[in-house]
């Protein structure tokens, strides 16, 4: 469910000749202004930890990390306390910087290992990386038998009257989310989907919410 839309099942099925050694949960918001992962950590910490445990069992490792930038002290404190029930899961506070949420940067910050140049992948240094939204979706799929039909979306910006994180159905038009947050002034220059650094301007606000 990350921006790169890399298939989850591929990460959970390591290729022949590779050996997972740890699971790293990317709880670093990869773009400024985005806070969907932060809200999930604060509102669903128990579910996130169960999801991490499920992923670790699926890939056969006994060590998991949750990397959270240090500008989210409430999430760090909450997850650290909750993780006491999971001695194999460690919450790792990370320096606030861009692009800390990049897979290679995250792996280096958490483990000290560097992923070689492409076509090398995180699994080549023993890491399986998933983001918070995917962890929560895995929890719901396994524990509640719930298919993926909704996700948390951040709607924010200086022109947004009521910035919010919304639980939206896949396929919901963006303009409905914007209206839910109070709408936009008529002279709004552009609406960006995906974040201010790597996102793209939306030419049409009828575009739907996607899984990635």
Model-derived segments and spans:
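Hydrophobic alpha-helical positions that pack around
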Residues: 62-174, 180-185, 195
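Iron-sulfur-cluster electron-transfer modules
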Residues: 1-107
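Conserved mixed alpha/beta catalytic, RNA-binding, or beta-rich assembly cores of soluble enzyme
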Residues: 1, 5, 16-19, 27-48, ...
């Amino acid at each position: 469910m990350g921006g790169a839309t890399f298939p989850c099942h591929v990460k959970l099925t390591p290729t022949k000749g590779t050996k997972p050694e740890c699971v790293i949960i990317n709880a670093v918001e990869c773009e400024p202004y985005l806070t969907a992962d932060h809200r999930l950590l604060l509102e669903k910490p128990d579910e996130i930890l169960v999801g991490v445990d499920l992923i670790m069992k699926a890939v056969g490792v006994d060590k998991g990390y949750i990397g959270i930038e240090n500008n989210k002290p409430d999430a760090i404190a909450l997850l650290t306390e909750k993780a006491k029930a999971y001695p194999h899961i460690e919450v790792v506070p990370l320096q606030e910087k861009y692009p800390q949420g990049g897979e290679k940067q995250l792996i280096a910050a958490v483990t000290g290992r560097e992923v070689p140049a492409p076509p090398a992948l995180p699994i080549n240094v023993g890491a399986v990386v998933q983001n918070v939204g995917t962890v929560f979706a895995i929890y719901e799929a396994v524990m509640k038998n719930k298919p993926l039909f909704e996700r948390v979306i951040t709607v924010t910006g200086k022109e947004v009257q009521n910035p919010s994180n919304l639980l939206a159905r896949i396929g919901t038009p963006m303009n409905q989310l914007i209206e839910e947050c109070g709408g936009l002034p008529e002279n709004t220059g552009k609406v960006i989907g995906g974040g201010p650094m790597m996102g793209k301007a939306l030419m049409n606000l009828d575009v739907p919410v996607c899984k990635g």
